[in-house]
Amino acid sequence: MPRQLFVTTALPYANGNFHIGHIMEYIQADIWVRYQRMMGNAVHFVCADDCHGAPIMIAAEKVGKTPQQFVADIASGRKPYLDGFHIGFDNWHSTDGAENHELAQAIYRDLKAAGLISTRVIAQFFDTEKNMFLPDRFIKGECPKCGAKDQYGDNCEECGAVYSPTELKNPYSALSGVTPVLRDSEHYFFKLSDPRCVEFLEQWTTDTNPRGQSRLQAEVYNKIKEWLLPDAEGKRDLGDWDISRDAPYFGIEIPDAPGKYFYVWLDAPIGYLAALKNRFIKLAGDATTGAQHYDDFMADPATEQYHFIGKDIITFHTLFWPAMLHFSGRKTPNAVFVHGFLTVNSEKMSKSRGTGLDPLKYLSLGMNPEWLRYYLATKLTARNEDVEFSPEDFMARVNSDLVGKYINIASRAAGFIAKRFGGQLGVISDDGAALLKQIQIERTSIEQLYEAREFAKALRETMLLADRVNEYVDANKPWELAKQTGMETRLHDVCTVCIEAFRALTAYLKPVLPLLAAQVEVFLNIEPLSFASVSQTLGAVHRIGDYKHLMQRVDIKQLEALFEAQAPVEPDNIATESVAPGGEGMAPVISMDDFSKIDLRIAKIVNCETVSGSTKLLRLTLDVGETNTRNVFSGIASSYQPEQLIGKLTVMVANLAPRKMKFGISDGMVLAASHADEKAQPGIYILEPFAGAQPGMRVH
């Protein structure tokens, strides 16, 4: 009987474009969904933008937009990525949609009715410069568990720990750089420490789902069991979860609690349900009928629910989320599938650090999206291991395996079928039938590997089968048979076997290469392939279409362009005058040893005043993290009023010998930029580091 599945990927935060890590996760889930549909199962594949939280509110304010406008603009840019890489979500929604507001408040009420919501006054970090309570993501410091520096206020990207912002060591505001102060605020908590929650999670995390499969990968359970197992004193790390934030906040207001909003991590996973409900409403054409269909679907014991996520958000999805669902009377996930990070040459992909492979650049260079789908699939397993992208390996796998082994089968046979036999397939001899039988026998194994998300193994088995087909071609040499008198029947037989084998291999590759498979279906003049169709043959009366080249090889120049930091600027044909950047030529090259002699430090301008007798200079009092402040003169009076600079961070040369000037001693030099021709482009601009830098930090 066909299965009915509800499949999601992690919701991307709506503060920027997709990076390649998003695309990898979507491709992984998309392959699994396509496999399920080829098996005859019904799947609802949904996702949404994660729209709430102070970071989006603050980002929107900076660009003069409402949060709603800001996230709408982000959402409008999703389609080129999804379409470009053939990712077939059935619905893309928003956590700010009406369905999410309704579901979040309903789940909260159910948890409250179950006695699992409490309130208490907590000390919360407050930014005295910005006059606001700081969201977790705008507090940084050292992880209280592993000591990693520059970690966010709610969880550690290094060890995965989840904690309260007040547990951070050496905290600072990411908005202003100041050390925040503690102020009291009443907060709402989900009582995860309740014995009922602990007992449920101990069972759920070790249990099997109705299909007899583990809900969590072994390595994932080994990670989260640290929260559940008592220590020598009988204490657990699993504490109550703070689910509220204070206004101003862009989010969903907590019922009967004016000025209090749900923490974004409470309503974000509920966005999975909201996206599904919104899909049913769209399918039904009206809200009432669609809502009923959603309720019926989720109440059906046969419905299976699966989440694909990255290993950095395990805790939210394997502890908080199932407990919220269970104690609000809702279905819990059948399984949570966790993958690792994508790395390039062993370096972690990170949007915040500005590193990685740009998906849109990949597409704009004319690179085939199915190259990337195939390559990532050859790396993806059921474990949450990191996926390594090597440009050299990428080119070798596509050119050698995909084109050289698989595509080559059709190209070696289709021409003879068309020219010598009018496009009609022939009768298959015993040796050809034996080869096709070998391919058919592997069907169950390959199906099981796709089901288990062992895509790398499924493709490895498929390419081993392609090797056997190519060995058959090399042994029979159709190009020589075509030259020999009386060998027409054998030529027809061999080429027919190749086409039949190519068709079966295409079925095995279809979840990974959907567009190519569709082109093959047209070329072979067949109905859409399923795994069941592998067990059949087309027969001697079947006619195929004309062969057209199905896939190009990767060009090394494309890969080189993909990983260039900046595309080279092509010179115009018309001669132009060479213009030096900033109005002056670059200085002579120096060695790293020379540069390392300069000690650049972050400095805070604690005071600034004009200099009597000078129209150019300002006197800056700088905090460089030392016991005493420094006095520095800077020729920036034409661009700044003293009060504009007080409290700002800048960069200074800290080891410059003190210089005696007419107005006093200048103990260092602050860095500022200006054009060489002040008359043509007036203005001098002091350098200011990003939020998070602290006085005394060295600039490397």
Curated annotation (Swiss-Prot):
InterPro entries: aa-tRNA-synth_I_CS, Anticodon_Met, Met-tRNA-synth_bsu_C, Met-tRNA_ligase_1, Met-tRNA_synth, Methionyl/Leucyl_tRNA_Synth, MetRS_core, MetRS_Zn
Annotated ranges, domain tRNA-binding: 594-700
Top EC class for this record: ligase
Molecular function GO terms recorded: ATP binding; metal ion binding; methionine-tRNA ligase activity; tRNA binding
Domain of life: Bacteria
Compartments in which it is found: Cytoplasm
Cofactor(s) recorded in Swiss-Prot or TrEMBL: Zn(2+)
Residues given in the record as ATP binding sites: 351
One GO CC annotation: cytosol
Cofactor notes: Binds 1 zinc ion per subunit.
Protein family membership: Belongs to the class-I aminoacyl-tRNA synthetase family. MetG type 1 subfamily.
NCBIfam families registered for this protein in UniProt: metG, metG_C_term, PRK00133.1
PANTHER family noted in UniProt: METHIONINE--TRNA LIGASE, METHIONINE--TRNA LIGASE, CYTOPLASMIC
Function per UniProt: Is required not only for elongation of protein synthesis but also for the initiation of all mRNA translation through initiator tRNA(fMet) aminoacylation.
Protein name per its UniProtKB record: Methionine--tRNA ligase
Designated gene of the protein: metG
